[in-house]
Amino acid sequence: MRLFIAEKPSLGREIAKGLGGGTNKGKYIEIGNGQDIVTWEFGHLLENYAPDDYDEKYKTNRLEDLPIIPSEWKMKLRGPDVKEQFDTIRRLVEKADSIVHAGDPDREGQLLVDELLEYLHNTKPVQRILLNALDEKSVKEALNDLRDNKDFVGLMNSARARSYADWLVGMNLSRAFSVPARNAGYPKALRIGRVKTPTMALVVRREEEIQKFKAVTYYQVQIDWRYQDAKIIRSLWQPDENIGGLDLEERLIDRSVAEGLLSKIQEANVSASISKIEKTTKKELQRLPYSLSALQVEAGKRFSYDPKTVLQCMQQLYEKKLTTYPRSDCDYLPENQFNDASEIIRGLTGVHEDLDMIAQNADLSIHSRAWNDKKISAHHAIIPTREKCDLGALDEKEQNLYLMVARAYLAQFYPEHIYQSTKLWIECANENFTATGKVILQDGWRSLYRKESSEDDTDGENSSLPNISKGEPVAYQAGSVLEKQTKPPTRFTPATLLQAMKEIHKHVKDKSLKNRLKSVSGIGTEATRATIIDSLIEADFLRLEKKFLVPTEQSYMMMKFLPDTITWPDTTALWEDELEDIKEGRKTVKEFIDGKLSTIQSCVNEAKWLKVDPPKNAVVCPDCGKVLVRRTGKNGYFWGCTGYPDCKKTYPDKKGKPDTEDHTVTCPACRTGRLRRLKGKYGYFWGCSDPDCRKNFRDKNGKPELPAMANH
């Protein structure tokens, strides 16, 4: 029996259809007489051990126990809800003669099935199916092109190394820096992540740049020249670098200089002429089809869709067999798929009026740069499938995204965009002016995007310039002084933050790393970036104001004391570079992890000596002067001193604040806590606020019934 293990039930059902259909047995599908069986996971069925799974002492967070470095990495079932499916797969693996790995064609999809087979001590031969599309023809083609799963060991190892690195950073550094933060009065445990924290820091630093920004007013002199009594050439003055009134950025900041120049030109009884001409013919190759991140960024700009919404919609389109695998980090296509183009384009006719004419005019003889086997890894760019799309059956977001994907695919079958760029230099009264213009010679693929394009609305640029020669005269027509201001950096939106994660080389602290990291595909993956941004919002590190991301007080607090190793993306970007080395077999998982231990230890050591400033609204303990924090005890909320165990003072909680007024009764049992009236299952009673004291007293007419010698 051949056993297929899919990443999720929907994928399993499509594989079963590709095999000819079968009988659904609930947790698997049996094909024919049982020669093939298709079962599935629900994402990861396994997860790494938590620290206290390795040793119960880690249930309490103590700096002296850190760092936690497993000598042997272990896994466990993700939870009781997956046990039945796990048991089904275990039984089927035991019966199977061979296994087909049907995880998603990416790093995590590879690990997801491999780790399960390893956990089950599988020794059966394993093949790999790569499904980039779920339409019937694509599934059957993939079934006829199974590969040896050993070819993907590097991909699995890189995913495993990523998992271990995330665990080491998250478990150790979250615990380490939570201790000094808690001692300073911050009630929440910190959550530090290898990718989350530098992503949060990008937003904090951008906000700090905006707050520090001071606008600079500067001036430009715009002159319109008349050529042959009809045509107007619009130009800008180019001040000499030695002229007064320029700042360090060579912006003119003295208005009187601009006004003086304008008067000089207006009053000059001298001719102006063309002193220099530059003409350049330029080509723009066809835009590439979409990777997931490119689609998320563009959909964010065009429709204000957040990255998570785009991923969810693309997953739906994939499962409806209308587009290919959504979590792709690739924007190229395999050369053998060029032969499918006529069938795909034929399927795009009749879908939408905007696509009809584009599809009909597509030139199948054009072979764009998108078709390149050398750029392909496990998956390719997102494109439409052969399946006919009923656009009316999709919601508005799915429609818009489908049309974006279809248009980008069709652009591959249109000519290059060709234009002529012209720059003129005009001399008048020993002053220089420049004018630029652009003439489209062949619109090509850009004609598909003309409605959305605003590139020709460039400030100060002429849509076209007259056919003029060097030395020809022009006459002054009109002039003005333009007042402009420098603009602050723009706040991140979810889409532009995702783009920054993808292009992380632009945001590193060590600029010498910039070129090296250009080849790294950013921090996070296509599948996780949207989730990371979402989780930062849910955990109150970031919040959305209108469509922009702004940091919260918690983020600013963390940035004050976390080391650069954690907050700058340099370290984690270099780790991504190493994960690529593991994938290609140039480095082992052990070598990678061993190289990270010194970084983890260094950060833990820093946390041990760290002093954190208390929060703005901190309440000071009246007894010792340290900070009170709100805690949960067996009888509800109370406030305890961060000086514990030296100071054991506690206070009852009153509407979220410590009630420090001494009007409560001291507990006669422990003499440190205070008695509070609480409502239990059988009515009111009095309990001690000290979490270590479990003494209770009956309620009598709203007061505690105490022993005769109790102190009040």
Language-model-detected regions and their locations in the chain:
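Structured, non-catalytic alpha/beta "coupling" segments that mediate domain-domain communication
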Residues: 27-55, 197-241, 354, 412-463, ...
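Metal- or metallocofactor-binding catalytic centers and their adjacent structured scaffolds
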Residues: 245-288, 296
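Basic, low-complexity terminal or inter-domain segments flanking catalytic cores
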Residues: 2-3, 82, 119, 174, ...
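C-terminal or mid-to-C-terminal helical accessory/interaction module adjacent to the motor/catalytic core
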Residues: 138-223, 280
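OB-fold/S1-family RNA-binding modules
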Residues: 51, 95-100, 140, 234-239, ...
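Intrinsically disordered, low-complexity regulatory segments
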Residues: 1-171, 488
